């Protein structure tokens, strides 16, 4: 009888855990641009063995529809080098904004200023204008931000001497912005910045950690960029909400009564 109860408890616990665990999934758009020639976001996620919904072909055809399970929309570095993707992202601005408003996170790392100087799919009140300036100098403004904390503790040294061909750590620094909180800067201009929107958030960067992880000039660049990709996913996707942890603890507390 006790064994039967134990089996029942384990089965119920598994069911309840699945119901309170975050059903977060990644949606991506990615492109092998003319400079790096690699679809680095895909390759990085495949290396990490992380499943994702690839909407690139749909976006090329002009549509962007998110699944209910999607929690993070990650646009690969230099994706807008593909003019069809650039134009379609702009045309689907409402879809992107609604995704964030409902609680989704949107991340866009480095884009070439000649392809996407102004990020036109951002909502009213938020602006991001990219430039052609690259820089090896930078400063972390918010060292306690979660993106530098887990699973890898990272500081300014972690980002030093990144490179791809002749480009340094900061690639296409953000020239101007409105409505964002700056997390890292270079030449007193934003490098990483984020803004809350509805229940979600927009994260813009002048870093290309996906490209640098796959196509960096040296092992240090590839390693550190990979560690930062892990941190991005942890900070903006995998972190378990406090309320979910509370529910799980409550469930376990009730089930212990069977023993």
Feature-to-residue mapping (PLM):
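A short acidic, often aromatic-flanked loop/helix-cap motif at beta-alpha or helix-coil junctions
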Residues: 59-65, 136-139, 146, 191
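Bacterial N-terminal signal peptides
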Residues: 8-18
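Bacterial N-terminal signal peptides that target proteins for export
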Residues: 1-9
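Helical hinge/lid and interdomain linker segments adjacent to catalytic or ligand-binding clefts
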Residues: 25-120
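Flexible, charged surface loops at secondary-structure boundaries
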Residues: 65-69, 100-101, 174-178, 196-198
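A glycine-rich, often tryptophan-bearing local segment used as a flexible ligand/cofactor-contacting loop or short
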Residues: 79-166, 170-176, 221-230
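Extracellular ligand-binding/catalytic regions of CAZymes and related secreted enzymes
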Residues: 22-30, 35-36, 117, 179-181, ...
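Short secondary-structure junctions
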Residues: 52-54, 127-131, 178-184
């Amino acid at each position: 009888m006790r064994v039967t109860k134990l089996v029942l408890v384990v089965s119920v616990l598994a069911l309840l855990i699945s119901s309170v665990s975050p059903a977060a999934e990644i949606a991506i758009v990615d492109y092998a641009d003319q400079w790096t020639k690699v679809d680095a976001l895909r390759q990085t996620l495949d290396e990490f063995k992380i499943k994702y919904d690839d909407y690139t072909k749909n976006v090329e055809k002009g549509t962007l529809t998110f699944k209910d399970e999607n929690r993070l929309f990650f646009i690969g570095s230099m994706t807008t080098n593909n003019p069809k993707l650039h134009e379609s992202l702009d045309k689907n601005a409402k879809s992107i904004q609604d995704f964030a408003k409902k609680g989704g996170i949107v991340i866009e790392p480095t884009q070439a200023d000649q392809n996407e100087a102004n990020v036109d799919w951002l909502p009213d009140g938020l602006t991001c204008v990219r430039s052609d300036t690259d820089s090896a100098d930078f400063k972390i403004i918010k060292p306690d931000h979660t993106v530098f904390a887990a699973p890898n503790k990272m500081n300014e040294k972690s980002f030093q001497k990144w490179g791809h061909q002749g480009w340094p750590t900061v690639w296409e620094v953000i020239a101007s912005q409105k409505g964002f909180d700056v997390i890292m800067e270079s030449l007193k201009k934003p490098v990483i910045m984020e803004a809350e929107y509805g229940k979600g958030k927009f994260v813009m960067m002048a870093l290309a950690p996906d490209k640098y992880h796959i196509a960096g000039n040296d092992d240090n660049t590839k390693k550190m960029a990979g560690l930062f990709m892990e941190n991005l996913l942890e900070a903006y996707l995998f972190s378990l909400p406090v309320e979910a942890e509370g529910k799980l603890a409550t469930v376990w507390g009730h089930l212990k009564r069977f023993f």
